[in-house]
């Protein structure tokens, strides 16, 4: 075996003895909150809160106009046809589908979609698209885009785009794949994030042919090239948090046998975001985060709290195989997102949404690393292998990082030497081209740094609006074209790629960079700036993590963390940020008086980089704008009959639930002693959280010790240690639980 073959970890710090250190514990006094002094900002029931967000008259933040709020394209996915002629862009914020020539020689075309799109795939032959989206009212649209050419070797001939079918499929579709069977049937495979399900759908009728339980929050999925297996990755852990082993899971559905296999990942693997398969379909590569939740959050250096990785799963056996680290020793690769392979199997490319970078990886060397693993190596062995450049010959580094500076880099496409990356926050497509001219000669490091110290290539969060500017000439040309197409709502400007300075990480390697706007450079509202900052790992010291590392979608990651604000050794379950600014105090222990205080403390003590007040206020604005996602337990947006009965019980003296959890926020904003104190806790009273969206915030309580609301109420006797819930009939217990899960 070639012992010099590197894995993707540059120099892994030794952890031997690293957890033995002294800590200073500050004791905090708790201040009672006057509930009468806090005036709710929303209407008096949770259903009007839903409609305020999901209805046509969504609230506009103070000081902004509706035009500001709705003026983003927000591309959520894109495809490039096999001929390399057309990009198809799903405009997640604008609710449209765009087709634009890749060479920039013609204006774009677009059509409105019946919902806001999330993901899409070509049908075989590239004459149609399958598009899923729509959030809690999830749908599948079939869009005709072309007709097959009479010449079987020629590309399809474009047609005016039109929606030919639109089917309801379930709550929050998160990914989609398509296949054509031997008998000519077209089947669509989709995952439903908040129904924990995968679907097989007949594209001709919209009928759901098969449905599988695939665990918590399936977020990304791929169909193997032979169409026999469907690989599904859960976004966050589905395990208890008060344990020493917690992680997300990957499942493989054998479509022929109709069987589902599951593999757990390594401890701490979470936030699985995107997936691609090796060209032969043998391996699934998944972008993810390694959460070191057993560490005290006393520092962030060297990935102490979180590291950034991609995972390898054997598709046929459904076994976890390996983890490869994307970080460098003193510079994290925060929040990996899009991941894609080249068709020739030579290159793997990953976008880093948190650091505005793209990572080039020689896929052949990854596969060789896997093939050369000794038989005795356990899964994850490569996590502890050092990157060491070959001494006999100069090779390409296993990892090349190139900075774009555009925010929200997400979905990725690889075509030969060209890489395209979608920039969600910039309404843009980025392009990088890798040019190799061996022999190679190393510069001192593997960064795309040329003669500039690598740290200077990073964009600090203090300048979140410091993004690449279009040249005056390009901006004028863009404005002219935009004006010419403004009268036609279905037209748009052509792609005009603006060249950025090329990067040369080592002699013999050049990476050209450019980007093309889908619309004029977005004018950021305060709320949008806050959203960008929340996703920005450059706001963190050494760029290891962002707020979404522990709070995806500003909700929960399912882990317990040991924050220093209330001592050490007493881990607490991650809280959702939903309504945090409306329901003080903050933190489970109530240690922060309000969310504004918590936001500023989070920058200082979790990201270890102080934010200026302007940026902190922007994050406040973003978090304050969050609205609940309607529960999957609702029926057509309303309480079920069971939940209606449960509501009566919830508000009655028989249960007393509404004493601590009164509407409209389902919290009295106070600390309570409910018997949930852990042996390591310094306090015995904890914040009464909002129950809104409690259906998605498991595991429950400060300890994260209950999988379900049923376990919490009936086994944990939460708030009912006198046994009052035991006196309910089984039907009444079911009704009460149904209501709580409907909030």
Language-model regions, residue ranges each:
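A short helix->beta-strand "capping" segment at the edge of beta-propeller domains
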Residues: 42-74, 321-325, 389-405
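Short, solvent-exposed loop/turn segments at conserved positions within beta-propeller repeat blades
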Residues: 92-93, 135-138, 193-194, 240-247, ...
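Beta-strand-rich domains and repeat architectures in extracellular enzymes and scaffolds
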Residues: 63-95
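Periplasmic c-type cytochrome electron-transfer domains
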Residues: 273, 286-287, 291-298, 306, ...
């Amino acid at each position: 075996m070639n012992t010099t073959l590197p894995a993707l970890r540059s120099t892994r710090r030794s952890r031997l003895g690293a957890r033995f250190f002294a800590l200073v514990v500050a004791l905090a006094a708790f201040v009672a909150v006057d509930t009468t002094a806090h005036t709710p900002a929303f209407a008096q029931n949770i259903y009007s809160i839903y409609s305020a967000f999901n209805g046509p008259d969504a609230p506009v933040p103070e000081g902004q106009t509706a035009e500001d709020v709705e003026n983003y394209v927000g591309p959520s996915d894109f495809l490039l046809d096999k001929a390399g002629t057309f990009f198809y862009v799903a405009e997640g914020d604008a609710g449209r589908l765009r087709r634009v020539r890749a060479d920039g020689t013609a204006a774009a075309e677009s059509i409105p979609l019946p919902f806001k799109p999330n993901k899409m795939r070509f049908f075989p032959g590239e004459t149609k698209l399958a598009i899923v989206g729509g959030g809690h009212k999830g749908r599948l649209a079939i869009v005709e885009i072309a007709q097959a050419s009479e010449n079987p070797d020629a590309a399809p001939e474009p047609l005016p785009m039109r929606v030919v079918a639109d089917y309801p499929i379930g709550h929050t579709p998160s990914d989609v794949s398509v296949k054509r069977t031997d008998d000519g049937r077209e089947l669509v495979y989709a995952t439903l994030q908040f129904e924990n399900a995968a679907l097989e759908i007949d594209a001709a009728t919209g009928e759901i042919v098969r449905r599988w339980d695939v665990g918590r929050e399936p977020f990304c999925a791929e169909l193997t090239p032979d169409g026999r297996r469907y690989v599904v990755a859960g976004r966050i852990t589905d395990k208890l948090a008060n344990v020493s082993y917690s992680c997300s899971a990957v499942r493989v559905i054998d479509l022929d046998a109709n069987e589902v296999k599951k593999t757990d990942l390594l401890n701490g693997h979470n936030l699985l975001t995107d997936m691609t398969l090796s060209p032969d379909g043998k391996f699934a590569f998944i972008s993810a985060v390694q959460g070191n939740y057993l560490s005290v959050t006393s520092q962030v250096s060297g990935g102490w709290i979180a590291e950034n990785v991609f995972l390898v799963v054997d598709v046929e056996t459904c076994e976890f195989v390996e983890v490869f680290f994307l970080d460098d020793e003193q510079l994290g690769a925060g929040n990996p997102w899009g991941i894609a392979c080249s068709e020739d199997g030579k290159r793997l490319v990953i976008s880093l949404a948190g650091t505005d970078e793209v990572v080039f990886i020689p896929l052949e060397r990854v596969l060789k690393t896997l093939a050369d693993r000794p038989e005795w190596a356990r899964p994850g062995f490569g996590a502890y292998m050092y990157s060491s450049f070959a001494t006999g010959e100069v090779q390409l580094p296993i990892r090349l990082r190139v900075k774009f500076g555009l925010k929200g880099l997400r979905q990725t496409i690889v075509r030969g030497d060209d890489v395209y990356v979608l920039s969600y926050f910039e309404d843009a497509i980025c392009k990088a081209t890798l040019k190799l001219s061996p022999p190679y000669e190393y510069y001192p490091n593997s960064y795309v740094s040329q003669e500039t110290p690598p740290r200077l290539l990073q964009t600090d969060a203090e300048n979140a609006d410091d993004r690449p500017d279009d040249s005056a000439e390009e901006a004028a040309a863009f404005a002219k074209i935009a004006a010419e197409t403004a009268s036609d709502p279905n037209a748009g400007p052509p792609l005009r790629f603006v060249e950025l300075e090329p990067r040369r990480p080592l002699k013999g390697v050049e990476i050209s960079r450019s980007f093309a706007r889908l619309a004029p450079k977005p004018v950021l509202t305060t709320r949008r700036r806050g959203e960008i900052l929340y996703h920005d790992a450059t706001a963190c010291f050494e760029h290891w993590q962002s707020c979404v590392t522990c709070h995806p979608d500003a909700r929960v990651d399912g882990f317990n963390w040991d924050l220093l604000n209330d001592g050490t050794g007493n881990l607490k379950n991650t809280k959702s940020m939903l309504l945090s600014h409306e329901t003080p105090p903050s933190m489970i222990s109530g240690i922060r008086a309000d969310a504004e205080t918590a936001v500023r403390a989070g920058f200082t003590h979790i990201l270890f980089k102080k934010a200026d007040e302007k940026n902190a206020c922007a994050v406040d604005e973003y978090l304050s704008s969050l609205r609940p996602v309607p529960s999957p337990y609702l029926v057509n947006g309303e309480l079920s009959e069971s939940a209606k009965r449960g509501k009566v019980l919830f508000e009655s003296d028989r249960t007393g639930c509404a004493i601590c959890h009164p509407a409209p926020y389902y919290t009295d904003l106070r600390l309570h002693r409910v018997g949930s104190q852990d042996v390591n806790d310094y306090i015995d009273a904890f914040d009464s959280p909002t129950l809104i969206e409690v259906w998605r915030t498991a595991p429950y309580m400060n300890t994260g010790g209950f999988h379900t609301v049923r376990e919490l109420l009936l086994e944990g006797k939460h708030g009912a240690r006198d046994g009052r819930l035991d006196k309910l009939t089984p039907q009444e217990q079911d009704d009460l639980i149904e209501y709580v899960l409907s909030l």
